[in-house]
């Protein structure tokens, strides 16, 4: 049985890690974990602990700090290494948060450091084709070293379910959930709720984050807008099922156009129509199709969002049909089986290059 070592100070409960670790196991791999006390000295700790040599090292999402030490140990033991960054530190600091100006000394230094870092991996995983293009264009990763594996959703938790019963006393519900960051554009949701003109509707924003206070201030005086605190991950599927329409992301930042957030995968798998910004991150075939359970609106356009939600809320039959289409889209493009095929392809690529001999 081949073994993969999940290397880094990662969160085992994060959905990307949970899903991929399960897919490795389903493919017949033994999955082990090594979480060093200090990321930069991980190779020293691994040597002192005499870690058994795995067939593959996987440095998971957000663990840029672990990559260098992991690569040193991997090269010493002749083990291939896959890096699954999910984000770019340069992208986050410059394009997303605007903390560093493009072309500034600090930005250029960060870019050079990250470009050098990515070269230590035998393969780099991207969660969308748009992110793969970014890694090639900006970070200088060789196209042949990149594979795309969508995040998907855990099917044991997120399953299609019927819409809530329609009653005159209880309005339909549109649900946004997330971490209230600029990429998600929660303020666009609040503004859309303020502009909304349509059948009675309850707008719910669930979660915590830097923009929540601002959103609460914008929502003052509007009784149809409410906020809920974050809830345990295991209770999220049931919360989704209580809503009729799910909202994705609406930020106008460059990064917002390169991602498919967890909640879009989870909402589609739950059989709910998702209204979200148009982005190049989705499969081309899906973008070209109709009736896929995704309703596109321009980034940052609150009025377009309000109008699209009003159209959906006015047609219960169409709402149900779109929910069924959403579940079908999840099965076709983002199911665990689809993710597993993408992972298998990435591992086969390593074997083709002679880096491993077990795929």
PLM features per residue range, with description:
Residues 288-303, 311-316:
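Conserved acidic donor-binding segment of nucleotide-sugar-dependent glycosyltransferases
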């Amino acid at each position: 049985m081949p073994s993969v070592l999940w290397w880094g100070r990662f969160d085992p409960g994060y959905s990307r890690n949970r899903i991929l670790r399960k897919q490795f196991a389903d493919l017949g791999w033994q999955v082990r974990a090594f979480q060093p006390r200090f990321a930069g000295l991980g190779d020293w700790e691994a040597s002192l602990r005499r870690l058994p040599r795995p067939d593959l090292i996987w440095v998971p999402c957000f663990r840029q700090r672990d990559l260098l030490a992991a690569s040193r140990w991997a090269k010493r033991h002749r083990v291939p290494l896959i890096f699954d960054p999910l984000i770019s530190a340069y992208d986050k600091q410059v394009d997303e948060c605007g903390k560093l100006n493009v072309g500034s000394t600090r930005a250029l230094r960060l870019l050079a450091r990250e470009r050098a870092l990515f070269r230590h991996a035998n393969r780099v995983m991207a969660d969308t084709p748009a992110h793969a293009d970014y890694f090639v264009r900006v970070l200088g990763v060789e196209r042949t070293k990149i594979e795309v594996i969508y995040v998907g959703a855990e099917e044991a938790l997120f399953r299609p379910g019927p819409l809530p019963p329609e009653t005159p006393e209880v309005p339909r519900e549109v649900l946004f959930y997330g971490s209230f960051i600029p990429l998600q554009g929660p303020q666009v949701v609040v503004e859309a709720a303020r502009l909304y003109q349509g059948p009675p509707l309850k707008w719910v924003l669930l979660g915590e984050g830097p923009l929540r206070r601002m959103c609460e201030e914008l929502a003052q005086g509007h009784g149809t807008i409410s906020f809920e605190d974050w809830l345990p991950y295991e209770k999220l599927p049931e919360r989704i099922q209580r809503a009729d329409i799910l909202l994705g992301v609406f930020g106008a930042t460059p990064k917002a156009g390169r991602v498919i957030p967890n909640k879009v995968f989870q909402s589609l798998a739950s059989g709910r129509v998702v209204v979200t910004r148009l982005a190049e991150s989705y499969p081309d075939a899906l973008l070209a199709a109709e009736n896929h359970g995704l309703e596109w609106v321009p980034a940052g356009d609150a009025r377009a969002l309000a109008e699209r939600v009003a159209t959906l809320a006015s047609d219960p039959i169409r709402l149900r049909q779109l929910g069924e289409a959403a579940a079908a889209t999840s099965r076709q493009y983002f199911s665990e089986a689809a993710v597993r095929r993408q992972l298998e392809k990435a591992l086969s690529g390593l074997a083709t290059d002679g880096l491993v001999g077990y795929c």
